[in-house]
Amino acid sequence: ERLAQTKVKIDRVIHDLTNMEQGNFKVRFAPNPNASLTVGHMRGVLINKYYADKYNGEFVLRFDDTSTDVKPPIIKAYIQILKDIKWLTGKAPDDVLIASDRMDIYYDYADQLLALNGAYMCNCKNFKELKDASIPCPHRDLSVEENLELFNKMKQGDFEAGEWVLRARTDLDAPNPAHRDFVLFRVQRNAHPRTGDSYK
């Protein structure tokens, strides 16, 4: 009874961002187009749009649609999500990017990272145990040339799903194990609804 009579005041103020310059600001909303937006997504849309408007910035919709195995994209979801955002905010996003349309860009950056020895190919089955113990995987010692050759084979579809991945070379002593040599690219065999079998 007493609990029912208690009124709780909730702070619903959206706080200012510090050191933010007007007009030099972008926010990104990156849903996976495998369903309609949820209430949680809608909250993200509205907060991002609020900040974009407040600081005269851009609101960018980026469809994160490269996973055909875990969250297969649905063509209708691209359209529905865009409609939902227009309905929620009163206008279309300032820019719309589709990750699957940018695979060649991502491949180019991966090649550059490999050339700088900032990434490596790995097929360790026990990688999680190594990562959690901050132990380097044996593939970290592959040469730049070996890594580039393996990555080219990956792009050509020479490997099966789960056989090889491209990992970022990071700090193995990072406090959060998720930040240690995380996966940048992996092989997928399911066709993409927009790009088909163009990328593996």
What are these language model-derived features?
Residues I98-A99, Q112-K200:
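Active-site cores that bind ATP or allylic diphosphates and position pyrophosphate for catalysis
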